[in-house]
């Protein structure tokens, strides 16, 4: 049996029933990585020895009569900006090349506690800044559905790992759509939880008021399983909220009777690919067939979200990335003649083009004379956008839109057109600005490329998202499609 083709919940059940050993499952995925990763460049580090050792330990527990809870030995790929003790944590940047984390992020502690097997560190856009994974200092990840196209970003490697069957589930991070957009491009389920639902302790910061850990899976059940095992309050992250984590498995039912869904007209205007538009419209009919009431609504201020996002996120990046100075850790220029020279040369050579662009933009909008005109104004717009969503959620349980305006674009197509690249996040960014949860699920294909449907929910209503996404998924077969590598 080709175990790497199975989904996480199927593997969990087989391991629990002692039909297969954790080590067998782990080796199946390690062999798959060896077979296909050079084609798609999903991983920056393969944790072969660590994964096999963990698998053997879990098998010993099972043999001694202990039942494994949580993930029960299922492999997980981890984005390379999430700290895993004794593994590299490069953020796909030259400035952190060779850096090894001395501790586990809280989400990794939770994964280990719940018997997950970490199989490798995934490629990404440098410091999570990008929408294509072309900004990695080390390699360009490729979309398994078309190797000439991008997988999306910034969590492109995490998406590719699951879409190419190198891992059944994976962790990424979200600042402006970095899980949902690659999920859409790669035909996966991708969740961005509520800001504060999951700890960010041990995750390298980009935009601190926007960042959130997210997850990739091949179906909604797997996504719910992974979320269940990492969510919750953390004393190490004061932004986490003491709100009970529901049993998400109870939300996995098909009936949508009584559910009210809003369709915002602003997300279906000029710039949306016609094929994507038709796929999403067909998907909306399925929700109605399953009992939901669907009605047009308006989110008029969402048009301003992208501009506000790039001001706020760049300002926060400028502050967060100031710590990479060539002194304490990371890349240190050997030719520097004094302290100032060390800072300038280490940062100039260590950071890539996009990271430097955003640092400069952020420094500019925070500077005297421009703070009020840009940063402060962006924060005011953010508050108005939050209010827009809260008005909508007084009437609707969820809001449905396309995840991205187009399917995956070609590698190199948008690298010289920065604004065009930024526009690929136009439908995902409002969610991060508001801090609400959102899930992307596969809803069809355009010219052989996957298309994603986005479902937005109110704060801490991940259970509602899982209910709606599962209902749609069970009425279609898009989630069962696998890329042919």
UniProtKB/Swiss-Prot annotation:
One Gene Ontology biological process: translation
Gene3D superfamilies linked to this entry: Amidase signature (AS) domain
GO molecular function: ATP binding; glutaminyl-tRNA synthase (glutamine-hydrolyzing) activity
Top-level division of the source organism's lineage: Bacteria
Active site: 79, 154, 178
Enzyme class: ligase
Subunit: Heterotrimer of A, B and C subunits.
Reactions catalysed, as given in the entry: L-glutamyl-tRNA(Gln) + L-glutamine + ATP + H2O = L-glutaminyl-tRNA(Gln) + L-glutamate + ADP + phosphate + H(+)
Transmembrane parts of this sequence: none
Physiological role: Allows the formation of correctly charged Gln-tRNA(Gln) through the transamidation of misacylated Glu-tRNA(Gln) in organisms which lack glutaminyl-tRNA synthetase. The reaction takes place in the presence of glutamine and ATP through an activated gamma-phospho-Glu-tRNA(Gln).
This protein's name: Glutamyl-tRNA(Gln) amidotransferase subunit A 1
Similarity-based family: Belongs to the amidase family. GatA subfamily.
GO CC annotation: glutamyl-tRNA(Gln) amidotransferase complex
